[in-house]
C-alpha cells in the first residue's frame, strides 16, 4: 500500500543512559515496523525519527518510551528537512581538474520539470523501468532531446531520487571506465547538497565533456570521485540554487464569525488561505489553506486560541515549495535557514565559495 504521507518533521533521540543504546536501536526498529508512516535513520552520531507532523512525532516518542524501547530518552527540538534545488541552467560550463592534474571534467546543472519530479516521487517513473520506456516518456511527454533521454545514466540519491545524471558528451574515450566513479560522486552530492548538505530535488546534471589520461592508473576512483563531487557542486552553485520547503494542506471547519482569527493565524505563519466553502446544512465553512511545515509547530493551539476553540484543523503534506530567495544574501530568510542547518550539523558557518570548486583552464 502506498501512503500519501511524507515524513516532513524529524527529531533526534538518544538513550539517557548510554548503556541502554542497544535497547533504543532495537526499539526504533520495532517502531518503524509497527508504523509504516515512520521513517527511522540510524547514523553513527544520532538516531532520527521522521514523522508526518508534530502530533505524530509526539505519539511515536511516547510509544518508543512506553512500549518499544522501555527506556528513558533525550530528544532534540523537532526539525524540518529542506531540499536544495536549482532554478536556472548553469551560467557557465564548470570544469574541475583531478588532484594529479591529468583529468578534466566539464558539467552543467539545470532544473527538472516539477511534474516530472512528482512522477518520480510517486513511483510512475522508476530507475528500475526499462530504459527505452523511460526515454520514450521523457521525449514524448517532457520534450527531451533524444540524445539526452537515451543517455540518462542514473537517478539519485539512493539510485531512485528525483535527480538525474546525463551523459551529454560526444565520442569521448574511456568514459565508460570512469562511469562508476561519476555515478558514485553524483549519489553523494544529491544526498548532501552544497548549501547545507540537504537532499537535492529536481536537479539534472549534464556531463558536457571529459579529458582523461591515457593510462588507467592515472584516472582511478581516487582521482575522479573527488573531482566529480567538486564539479557537481560548482554546477549547482552556478545554476541559481534555492531551497524548497515542505508545505501542509490544512482543512479547517470553522464558523463564519471567527474567520478573522483564521486569517490572522495563517498570515502570522506565512500561510495562504485559498478556498472557503459553506458546508451544506451547517453554519460552518470549510476552509483550505497552505501552511509551511516549519511554521506549523504550535499551530493548532494558536488557531484554537484565536477562534475561541471553534476552528478544527486537519493537516497533511501537500507539496514542496521554492523559497525564492538567494541563500547567499545575508539579509534573506534562505540565508538564515542555511546558517541554522549548518550550525545544527556542525558545518562551517561560512558559505562555500565557487572558486574552491572550479578550476581555470
Regions found by a protein language model. Give the residues of each.
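Accessory interaction regions appended to the cores of large information-processing enzymes
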Residues: 1-361
Amino acid at each position: 500500500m502506498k501512503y500519501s504521507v511524507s515524513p516532513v518533521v524529524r527529531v533526534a533521540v538518544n538513550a539517557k543512559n548510554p548503556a541502554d543504546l542497544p535497547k533504543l536501536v532495537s526499539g526504533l526498529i520495532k517502531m518503524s515496523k509497527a508504523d509504516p508512516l515512520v521513517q527511522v535513520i540510524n547514523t553513527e552520531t544520532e538516531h532520527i525519527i521522521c514523522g508526518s507532523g508534530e502530533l505524530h512525532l509526539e505519539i511515536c516518542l511516547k510509544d518508543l518510551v512506553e512500549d518499544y524501547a522501555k527506556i528513558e530518552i533525550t530528544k532534540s527540538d523537532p526539525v524540518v528537512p529542506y531540499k536544495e534545488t536549482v532554478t536556472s541552467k548553469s551560467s557557465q560550463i564548470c570544469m574541475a581538474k583531478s588532484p594529479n592534474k591529468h583529468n578534466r571534467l566539464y558539467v552543467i546543472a539545470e532544473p527538472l520539470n516539477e511534474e516530472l519530479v512528482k512522477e518520480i516521487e510517486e513511483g510512475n517513473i522508476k530507475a528500475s523501468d526499462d530504459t527505452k520506456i523511460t526515454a520514450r516518456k521523457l521525449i514524448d511527454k517532457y520534450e527531451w532531446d533524444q540524445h539526452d533521454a537515451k543517455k540518462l545514466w542514473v537517478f539519485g540519491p539512493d539510485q531512485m531520487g528525483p535527480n538525474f545524471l546525463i551523459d551529454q558528451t560526444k565520442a569521448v574515450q574511456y568514459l565508460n571506465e570512469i562511469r562508476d566513479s561519476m555515478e558514485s560522486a553524483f549519489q553523494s552530492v544529491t544526498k548532501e547538497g552544497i548549501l547545507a548538505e540537504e537532499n537535492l530535488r529536481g536537479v539534472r546534471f549534464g556531463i558536457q565533456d571529459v579529458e582523461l589520461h591515457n593510462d588507467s592508473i592515472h584516472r582511478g576512483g581516487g582521482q575522479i570521485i573527488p573531482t566529480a563531487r567538486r564539479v557537481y557542486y560548482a554546477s549547482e552553485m552556478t545554476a541559481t540554487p534555492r531551497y524548497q520547503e515542505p508545505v501542509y494542506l490544512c482543512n479547517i471547519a470553522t464558523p463564519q464569525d471567527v474567520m478573522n482569527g483564521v486569517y490572522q493565524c495563517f498570515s502570522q505563519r506565512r500561510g495562504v488561505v485559498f478556498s472557503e466553502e459553506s458546508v451544506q446544512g451547517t453554519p460552518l465553512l470549510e476552509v483550505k489553506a497552505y501552511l509551511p511545515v516549519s511554521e506549523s509547530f504550535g499551530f493548532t493551539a494558536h488557531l484554537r486560541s484565536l477562534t475561541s476553540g471553534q476552528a478544527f484543523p486537519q493537516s497533511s503534506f501537500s507539496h514542496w515549495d521554492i523559497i525564492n530567495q538567494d541563500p547567499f544574501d545575508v539579509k534573506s530568510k534562505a540565508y538564515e535557514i542555511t546558517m541554522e542547518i549548518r550550525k545544527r550539523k556542525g558545518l562551517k558557518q561560512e558559505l562555500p565559495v565557487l572558486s574552491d570548486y572550479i578550476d581555470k583552464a
